[in-house]
Amino acid sequence: MNMEIGHPHEGKDDLGDKRVIMGTKFPMELGIRVGLGKEDSRCGESPVVSNKCEGRMAPPETKFPLSKGLEMGLERQNISRTVMQRGSLGVDSVSASQGTKPSLLPGRMGLENESLLAGYTHERIIQPPLGRVCGSSQAAGSRRAPLASGPEGVEELVGKPAFVMEPRQEMEKESTCVLMKPNTEIKLPVEVDIGLTQAEGPDETKNTEPQMGLVIEPPQCQFAQQHEQRKEAGNIESGVEPPDRIRPIYSGKFFDRTPCWPSAGKVIPVGYRVATCLTEKLPRLITPPEAKKYFNFRYPPAGVERVFYGRANDPQIAPYLTHGIRSKISVLANTLINPQPITTFQQKIKDKKESIYLSNRRAPLGKSHDQAPGLPKGMDTTNTTFGTAVIKEYSAKDVVNPPKSYEEVFKEGNEGHDLYVVSHNDYYAGEAKNRKYNPSSFHRCSVYGVPTPHFNDGRAMAKSLYWLHELQMKRGAKFVSKRADDFKEKFQHKLGRVLDPIAETMNVPPDCTFGACLRPEEYGVGDLIHNRLPDEYLRGKDRQRALIAAVRHHLKKVNYQKFDTLLAAFRHYDKKGDGMIDKDELQEACDQANLSLDDKLLDQLFDYCDVDNDGFINYLEFANFLNWKDKMLLKEYEERVIIKGRKPDCVNPTEANVEEPEQTLLIKPEDIVLKEAGSTEKTLRTLLRPSDKVSNYYKTTSSEINAIVGAIPSTCYPICGVPTIRSDIPAPRIRRISDRTNYGEEGSAYSLLYPTIFARKGVFERDFFKTRSKEEIAEILCNIGVKLSDEEFENVWNLASKKHHRGEVCVENIRNVLDELRHADRIKCKTLM
């Protein structure tokens, strides 16, 4: 089918005038074209008919009004054919589209709205059309990519199925066609880039006759939509695009030939960035009062009462209610604290009113009691003295701290005590009251009744330190949560037990032990260190050793409290007087000391004290194991005590013929040692048990560090480290507050616990080393009771002044000189004797 679309030369004059057809409808043409524009479909054509699409796609974000749409339509597309030919073309296109298969590419859909068919007449290309605007809203706002024109483009469309076209009658009724006769003055666009390949013909530039185009007015719904979109655009702030208007990702850079295909990636609206989200929009939106009460009920502000939204608008009566009786305003507090000053006249009137009270006359405010009204008239109150004159004998200082020694004060205090007991009941602390009973039948030191139970372990004192309810709480049952008890039983460690979290799942008794039981060794670490024999192992004998230690401690305490010397204690134990203590005598002594020992414990005690294993406890063993020999020193007469021989037993005739042994000393001379090196006090040597002899070869680190007695002093060799007391540097005269260095002039913990007599009297080190004159030194010696003649004082002063390079004398120098002179006199007296 060969069809030439265009205007013949004969028809130009008929169409010269511009005609406007209002309400003219071409059912076949408009229906097909509007329907194709709405459904985004394209009609197929025959190979003879060619389409030349020269349309430019408008940007999706730009929406033009009606006038701009018509102008752009004229510039974009031109229709160069008559109305009747268009009608016939529409019929042909419909028939051609119906004959094709129903399948088109998405990119080809809707091309009919933006492209026009251009006929070829014997290889002559007709002049490009002027333009057309479609009245469909979808056609105006849709984005379509232009297709390539020419033979290739036409051939590709032949045989392809066409999209099913459903013309809409509503859009046909609303659309309006305007036929315009183009004027020769209208200038065509110089260059329009539509993205399609255009065929260039030699006769294309020759055909410059103006053609008539068909303009289809857009429907009214498009104008309403554009008005709403303008309103929405006005509400959005400047610089931010609405989120529903998304531009292509290639806009401005590339030409999207397939805009209907989804683009890869996520397109973020332009303008919604982090800075925009973090920027507060002011002024803020105001919540309506109707919704505010619900918000305040659910989220009340800080410090505001939560009010139910049902009574949010109720009248507020409670804040203005007043309960009780309204009190009247009294005098203000500032008036009471700082009253207004009164005048002199008002003060005199006030004093006159107050003078009638007895308290004002006896104890007036701010002055003493005026006794003149009660005295006889004419008495000289200034020179008259009442009472008896007191003779001044002693000052309060002498009464509190008399200038006497302690012995004199104590002796004077005891004088007349018996008289004060009768007159004033002045008893000493703990002194019993003497009721003066008949001494023939009663002795004041006698004790009657049952002895009070007494325990040395302090159980009675421990009981008295607790309140009764505390003791009852200890004896009472303690309630513990079963959940907490189960948790502690399962997860907390217990002393002497291995942690077993799965113990509850094991069906074994609590005392079950897995694995082979190891037999404990007979010896311990201490036995290995001291190299003890098997019969002397101490492992497993802790209870036995503890009992023996307790018995020995009790006997030591009794001996120390009851006897003054070791010899007196030994004679108390030695009932037979043979210088030895046997087991029976030890049993009797323990009974007298309120110690009831069984035979086994007595044997263990006796074996412990009997070092030489002779069956008796001698004086040396008694002093080492049953006494505190360091506190009960040896007297001189104890060294000369002689042991008498034992008398023979007359029952045994063999012992009767034995001669009596020679008399020996109770203490051997080699058993007597000095208590300390250089001391005159003597004590007995320390006995070592056979198992303890090995310990002499072992020395601890602390004993080696502290064993400096008699060694080279530390001043003879350098010492590393900084000393605790910095005696190596002089103390500053004025010390800083932050200086915590001990220069040796400060007291130690011992001086705080046991202060000297000087510290008790408030005399410190600086007072001893302060330089003083001769008169001040003489006065100090006289006040402390040191009586020296003038010659002796001069001698002491001269010796003390020689100890300083500048001849200065202090109290410490005088004290040292007096000690030296006294020591020299003592030595002189001993030499003369």
Curated annotation (Swiss-Prot):
Residues 561-596, 597-632 form the EF-hand domain. GO terms for biological process: calcium ion transport; flagellated sperm motility; negative regulation of protein binding; regulation of calcineurin-NFAT signaling cascade; regulation of store-operated calcium entry. GO terms for molecular function: calcium ion binding; calcium ion sensor activity. Pfam families: EF-hand_7, EF-hand_EFHB_C. Its main location: cytoplasm. InterPro entries: EF-hand-dom_pair, EF_Hand_1_Ca_BS, EF_hand_dom, EFHC1/EFHC2/EFHB. It is found in: Cytoplasm, Cytoskeleton, Cilium axoneme; Cytoplasm, Cytoskeleton, Flagellum axoneme; Cytoplasm. Microtubule inner protein component of sperm flagellar doublet microtubules. Interacts with STIM1 and ORAI1; the interactions take place upon Ca(2+)-store depletion and dissociate through a Ca(2+)-dependent mechanism. Interaction with STIM1 inhibits STIM1 interaction with SARAF. Microtubule inner protein (MIP) part of the dynein-decorated doublet microtubules (DMTs) in cilia axoneme, which is required for motile cilia beating. Cytosolic sensor for calcium, modulates the interaction of STIM1 and ORAI1 upon store depletion and the activation of store-operated Ca(2+) entry (SOCE) and NFAT translocation from cytosol to nucleus. This is EF-hand domain-containing family member B.
